[in-house]
């Protein structure tokens, strides 16, 4: 007999060889039905793995994040199974879990399009209903190679060859087998709520020199209700797509001459200026001086900073006068050069620098996505140089600033995470203990709840991440606050302490909105293009019922502009209904409509974008009304 301890501290006795599924059944049939896998002494295992000794056990169900991930990974296998049934000559490659779903890459011999997805999905449902048990076997590497070679699965053979392990795990359901580390669901019958969503091209191993594969995306959920809710969200997200809205509102465009880099139009630049000016004012409030540093620097700087060894593939390089240069992928090393121009005393610290720094990263073309994933973007970087004693207070201020910014932009629902030390890191445990505690203390001081994520910090320090939730429930990873033990040492950022000794400065990195391009894309989708008044590129459209009001329209327009309102004058010889519809589609917050009565009484009639009639008032009262909203960030 063996003793199994549960998360609540209780201990129960079982026969040796029992598995997690049996344990779940002994508690309740419904728990067994929901069990996907289990943690056995902190190791994630298949639900049918035998337990032969005393242990701690935590059952993983579909309600747990790990359970949902296992469900989705198993659904990717079901997709591959269905494809092999329908297209036997297809070679399967890899099928990982991604946000809210999964994908699988295939090498089809036939031409496959979006129209084929319903057929594949139907086959998946047929296979799931078979309730096939899912099992695995562990075999020597050579045997796994022979097994997949015999099936003509050359990509699997290549994958196995690239793995250092001498033992391979092969999962089987019905007549389909796949290479996988697992764990997987106990039975295919639990796969009931899934949908194939789209098809795309993807190079094998992300290398454009390799074969172009067909990538099929899908989503999978614990219940049909969850699936329906997600599909509704996707439908709403499609309506809010910033690329479509950006075209309608004439904000920006992309073209193949400059892939992954936006061409900003006048309306887009107006939004950009509001975001940048707001952040500049916020930085001033929190004591940051603004700097501007070169986009290009000698490659030796990137070698010293460590970027050359870690980001070389994502860096754009150039040559001039027999010297190697790189376009910066990050702003930190050039910021340190500004700090290093002076000798600093501990009395000078903290020194806070902010920069709207343009960076370039050679992202794969297949990953580019409007403003959300680009090759050139402007980062609202901040770098703080301070003493160890000042770190906690600086982080407290940065957290406070982040919260102010997000709330002003209309994001009131967010999650905060602390990424803790990874296995491969620099610095001793004592330093990491102190650093991680500082981040926790700073969040506690701001009354912020947070989650801990062990192993997800950078090798040079822990960090805080801010994840914003938008109007339709999507989560966006946005700001970061990062402690850095490495770069100040590498680049010689020092100060003189009170004993006259030279010390390495502590460096804090922070980005609040992050990439301005991405943040503006987020804002467009969050508000579905209906930006709040203070951000709207055009705040008021002025129009007359007939051309008889042209002079009065011009007079009102000039008064609005003099009061700092971004107004548009529409004197076209069109029907008033046409003008109203057009400016409504352009998401202009307020429409000023002028007729004979307004002209004679020197008043204006105001209509909101929503269609609500605000009645009549003087131009001065309207300007005061608008200014109140703008100041309140409404």
UniProtKB/Swiss-Prot annotation:
Q: Which family does it belong to?
A: Belongs to the class-II aminoacyl-tRNA synthetase family.
Record keywords: Aminoacyl-tRNA synthetase, ATP-binding, Cytoplasm, Ligase, Metal-binding, Nucleotide-binding, Protein biosynthesis, RNA-binding, tRNA-binding, Zinc
Reaction catalyzed = tRNA(Thr) + L-threonine + ATP = L-threonyl-tRNA(Thr) + AMP + diphosphate + H(+)
**PANTHER family linked to this entry:** THREONINE--TRNA LIGASE, CHLOROPLASTIC_MITOCHONDRIAL 2, THREONINE-TRNA LIGASE
* Predominant place of localization: cytoplasm
Protein's job: Catalyzes the attachment of threonine to tRNA(Thr) in a two-step reaction: L-threonine is first activated by ATP to form Thr-AMP and then transferred to the acceptor end of tRNA(Thr). Also edits incorrectly charged L-seryl-tRNA(Thr).
Q: List the disulfide bonds.
A: none
Q: Which GO terms describe its biological process?
A: threonyl-tRNA aminoacylation
Q: Organism's domain of life? A: Bacteria
Q: What is this protein called?
A: Threonine--tRNA ligase
The record's region (Catalytic) falls at: 241-532
Please name the Pfam families in this protein's record.
HGTP_anticodon, TGS, tRNA-synt_2b, tRNA_SAD
Q: Look up the record and report any one GO term of the cellular component aspect.
A: cytoplasm
Localization, per the record, is:
Cytoplasm
Annotated InterPro entries: aa-tRNA-synt_IIb (IPR002314), aa-tRNA-synth_II (IPR006195), aa-tRNA-synth_II/BPL/LPL (IPR045864), Anticodon-bd (IPR004154), Anticodon-bd_dom_sf (IPR036621), Beta-grasp_dom_sf (IPR012675), TGS (IPR004095), TGS-like (IPR012676)
Give the species this sequence originates from.
Francisella tularensis subsp. holarctica (strain LVS)
The entry lists its GO molecular-function terms as: ATP binding; metal ion binding; threonine-tRNA ligase activity; tRNA binding
């Amino acid at each position: 007999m063996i003793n199994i301890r549960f998360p609540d501290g209780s201990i129960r006795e079982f026969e040796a060889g029992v598995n997690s599924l049996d344990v779940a059944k002994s508690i309740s049939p419904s728990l067994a039905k929901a069990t996907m896998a289990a943690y056995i002494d902190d190791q994630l295992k298949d639900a049918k793995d035998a337990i032969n000794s005393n242990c701690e056990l935590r059952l993983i169900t579909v309600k747990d994040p790990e359970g949902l991930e296992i469900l989705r990974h198993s659904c990717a296998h079901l997709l591959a199974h269905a494809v092999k049934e329908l297209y036997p000559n297809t070679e399967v490659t890899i099928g990982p879990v991604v946000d809210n779903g999964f994908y699988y890459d295939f090498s089809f011999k036939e031409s496959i399009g979006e129209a084929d997805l319903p057929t594949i999905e139907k086959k998946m449902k047929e296979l799931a209903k078979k309730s096939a048990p899912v099992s695995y076997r562990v075999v020597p590497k050579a045997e796994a190679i022979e097994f997949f070679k015999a099936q003509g699965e050359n990509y699997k053979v290549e994958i196995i060859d690239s793995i250092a392990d001498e033992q391979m795990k092969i999962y089987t359901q019905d007549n389909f087998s796949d290479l996988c580390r697992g764990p997987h669901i106990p039975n295919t019958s639990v796969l009931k709520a899934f949908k194939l969503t789209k098809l795309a091209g993807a190079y094998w191993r992300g290398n454009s020199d390799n074969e172009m594969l067909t990538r099929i995306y899908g989503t999978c959920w614990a219940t049909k209700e969850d699936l329906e809710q997600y599909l509704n969200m996707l439908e709403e997200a499609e309506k809010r797509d910033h690329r479509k809205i950006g075209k309608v509102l004439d904000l920006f465009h992309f073209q193949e001459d400059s892939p992954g880099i936006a061409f900003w139009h006048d309306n887009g630049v107006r939004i950009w200026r509001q975001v940048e000016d707001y952040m500049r004012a916020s930085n001033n409030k929190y004591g940051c001086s603004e700097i501007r540093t070169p986009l290009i620097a000698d490659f030796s700087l990137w070698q010293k900073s460590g970027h050359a060894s870690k980001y070389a593939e994502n860096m754009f390089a150039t040559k001039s006068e027999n010297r190697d240069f790189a376009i910066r992928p990050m702003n930190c090393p050039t910021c340190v050069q500004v700090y290093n121009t002076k000798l600093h005393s501990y009395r000078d610290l903290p020194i806070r620098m902010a920069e709207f720094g343009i960076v370039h990263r050679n992202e794969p073309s297949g990953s580019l996505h409007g403003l959300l994933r680009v090759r050139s973007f402007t980062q609202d970087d901040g770098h703080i140089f301070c003493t160890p004693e000042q770190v906690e207070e600086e982080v407290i201020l940065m957290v406070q600033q982040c919260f102010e910014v997000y709330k002003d932009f209309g994001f009131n629902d967010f999650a905060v995470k602390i990424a803790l030390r990874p296995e491969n890191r620099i610095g001793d445990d004592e330093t990491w203990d102190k650093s991680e505690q500082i981040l926790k203390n700073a969040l506690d001081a701001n009354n912020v709840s947070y989650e801990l994520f062990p192993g997800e910090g950078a090798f040079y320090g822990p960090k805080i991440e801010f994840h914003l939730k938008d109007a339709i429930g999507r989560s966006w990873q946005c700001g970061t606050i990062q402690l850095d033990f490495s770069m100040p040492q590498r680049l010689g950022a020092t100060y003189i302490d009170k004993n006259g000794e030279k010390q390495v400065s502590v460096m804090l990195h922070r980005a609040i909105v992050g990439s301005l391009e991405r943040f503006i894309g987020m804002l467009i989708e969050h508000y579905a293009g209906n930006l709040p008044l203070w951000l709207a590129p055009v705040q008021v459209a002025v129009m007359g019922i007939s051309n008889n009001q042209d002079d009065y329209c011009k007079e009102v327009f000039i008064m609005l502009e003099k009061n700092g309102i971004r107004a548009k004058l529409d004197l076209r010889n069109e029907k008033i209904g046409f003008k109203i519809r057009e400016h409504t589609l352009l998401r202009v917050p307020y429409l000023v409509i002028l007729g004979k009565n307004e002209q004679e009484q020197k008043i204006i009639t105001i209509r909101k974008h929503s269609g609500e009639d605000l009645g009549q008032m003087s131009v001065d009262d309207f300007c005061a009304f608008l200014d109140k909203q703008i100041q309140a960030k409404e």
